[in-house]
Amino acid sequence: MDTLQQSPPAEPEGGLRRNLKKRHLLMMSLGGTIGTGLFIGIAEPLSSVGPAGTLLAYLFAGTIMLATMMCLGELSCAFPHSGSFQHYALMFMPSPCWSYTIGWLYWFSWVFSLAADLTAAGFIAHQFFPAVPVYMFCLAILLILTAINLTSAKSFGECEYWLSAIKVFAIVLFICAGGVMIYSLMGHSDWHPTLKTDGMWFPHGWEQIVVCMTIVIYSFQGVELVGNAAGETESPHIILPKVILGIGLRIILFYGLAIAVLALVYPHELTPNGQSPFVWVFSHAGIPGADTLMTLVIFSAAVSAANSAIYASSRMLWSMAGDCFAPACFGKTNGGGVPVYAILITALLALVSLLTRYIPAQQFYLYLIASTGQVGCLAWITIGWCQYRFRQSVRNGTYASDLLRYRSPLFPWTARFVIITNFAIMVGTWFSKQGVVIMLVELAFMIGILLSWYLFRPTLSRLRNTVG
């Protein structure tokens, strides 16, 4: 760019409407990361790295998440857009190829995440109604959530607000119940709380913490949904700076306290069998019906995560259509201001969750979350890189300084921290169970998307020139 860039238009283009409010964004951000990755996925780290390793892994992942939020907040305050980092990659990456690639990778990852969350919800519902197969529950939940998202962004926001409120309340209740349980055990038994396992801090070696970070980081991924929602939020320049730091600190607090309780009372030697460690704690806390209540909370968490997945993936596809990286039909909206065809194609591909008819639900779920975790790391790397390039562009005068409505602290170290740590987590995947297979599958996806870019580049370039 040769000329000084001024502030972007206040209203979104393409038919989307700014009808999400501050309370939607607050609860969406907070509840969006409290999902199946925490309630169910935590069983694997507890088993593989022990209580101390699990606590360290989640605190470290939370720090990465907070740094990413700060970088994304700076970009979203300057350029509120429902395409979030995919659109920012088009602005700040040297080639549009990466914007195209990360956009499609991220969309596919949300589709798989949607399938994982549907699988988790279906698996839980199946426990209450064993006569109904898991895949039938998956289909029913998908149809209901698709109908909600087709109505309006406000309908999505209201649904997500109350589902997230349930999760937040449950976490607070769990921390209180766990605290009482620890206190009673200390006073009436020979048990003493410790984070050690057989006298060791890390029973399988500290390097296992790096290996399990793919599953751990998945628990926090979804917080970047704030960037997508910024394009449909009232007064994003005012709201976002107020929520970013507070949301990040609250998430770390909730995760830290909840996992500390789990690390102290949950037997790490238990083999993950599909039951949430949270349910195990409640069932041993002596509260009548608490384990059943927690199971229902986890069900709502899975439904909430699936709801967010439909929203995020459809907005990403809408953004790519606007950038001429996807068919134009995905950019069309209905009277409620939602991208109809983007939502429908997302729901259609999420029917992969019906494979639970042939694959055990727990095994299928773990495979899906490990796969999506890698793309999430790439997305966070993109956010860090774009924020770094944006701040450099402001310094050299390419962009006006008044765009810095929110400044990410400790520049450039925050962005560098985000990039380096996420890259290290991706490397660690190679040493995890089935890590090589997961990486090869994702590499095949990336190569396929890159090949499609070079195959369709002449057509895409003509479309972009015509629109521009």
Report the location of each language-model feature.
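Membrane-interface "cap" regions at the ends of multi-pass membrane proteins
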Residues: 1-43, 47-52, 66, 70, ...
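Helix-loop-helix connectors at the membrane interface of multi-pass transporters/channels
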Residues: 3, 86-97, 118-138, 170-173, ...
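Helix-loop-helix junctions that connect adjacent transmembrane segments
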Residues: 9-16, 55, 130-133, 164-295
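Hydrophobic transmembrane alpha-helices that form the core helical bundles
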Residues: 44, 57, 66-150, 155, ...
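TM-loop-TM module centered on a large, flexible mid-protein loop between adjacent transmembrane helices
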Residues: 87-95, 127, 243-309, 326-372
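Membrane-interface loop-to-helix entry segments
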Residues: 122, 135-190, 221, 244-248, ...
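C-terminal membrane-solvent junction of multi-pass transporters and transport-like membrane proteins
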Residues: 162-163, 329-340, 380-433, 463-468
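A generic transmembrane alpha-helix motif of multi-pass inner-membrane proteins
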Residues: 177, 181-182, 363-367, 371-379, ...
